A protein has these predicted regions:
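Substrate-gating cap/lid region and adjacent catalytic-acid/histidine neighborhood
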Residues: 1-109
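Alpha/beta-hydrolase-fold serine-hydrolase catalytic core, especially in secreted/extracellular enzymes
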Residues: 34, 46, 57-67, 75-78, ...
């Protein structure tokens, strides 16, 4: 949470030898709102590249089901934001159980509003294969060409893939 610029560079040098400067450039371009040095260490490069790969492969299947990509960007206010948007944070929102998990979500009004949106998207997707509903911006199916991605946050937005260069750098593909 309180990592210095120097400790972040040391971590990145060990994790991505010879790629630190490009990593920082691409990460800041993809995530300009990340202000703390530690934010640059917390970018998901463990699960995200695989998710993008799967979305690209599955969306290319002729006659296959549409693919809907999302990122859960909402930041937990608990412990002065220590949790940020940890892996699996969206589960309580998808099942609309944020009050039961208030120790992680804070159980705020804003969190409840987002939980209602995320839950309905999951329900719609389970019922129809399409997560769209009137509480969200139009969410096009993902393709490798449009890279349409829903960003779940207090204000939900659809954007193209912002971290493509970073993923290519990290994976070497």
């Amino acid at each position: 949470l309180n990592a210095s610029n120097e400790s972040v560079r040391t971590y990145l040098d060990k994790t991505y030898p010879g790629k630190t400067d490009k990593y920082l450039e691409y990460a800041k371009k993809a995530w300009p709102t990340h202000k703390r040095p530690s934010d640059l260490m917390d970018i998901d490069m463990r699960f995200r590249p695989g998710a993008v790969y799967q979305a690209n492969v599955k969306s290319a299947v002729t006659g296959g089901a549409p693919v809907y990509m999302y990122l859960f960007d909402w930041q937990s206010p608990v412990l002065d934001g220590k949790y940020k948007s940890v892996h699996c944070m969206e589960i309580a929102f998808a099942f609309n159980t944020i009050q039961r998990t208030h120790n992680m979500t804070g159980g705020t009004k804003e969190a409840q509003k987002l939980a209602d949106k995320v839950n309905l998207a999951w329900v719609n997707f389970a019922k129809t294969g399409n997560p769209n509903h009137k509480g969200l911006p139009k969410w096009p199916a993902y393709t490798e060409q449009n890279t349409s991605t829903m960003h779940f946050d207090n204000v939900c937005t659809v954007k193209p893939q912002l971290d493509k260069e970073l993923i290519e750098l990290v994976t070497g593909q």
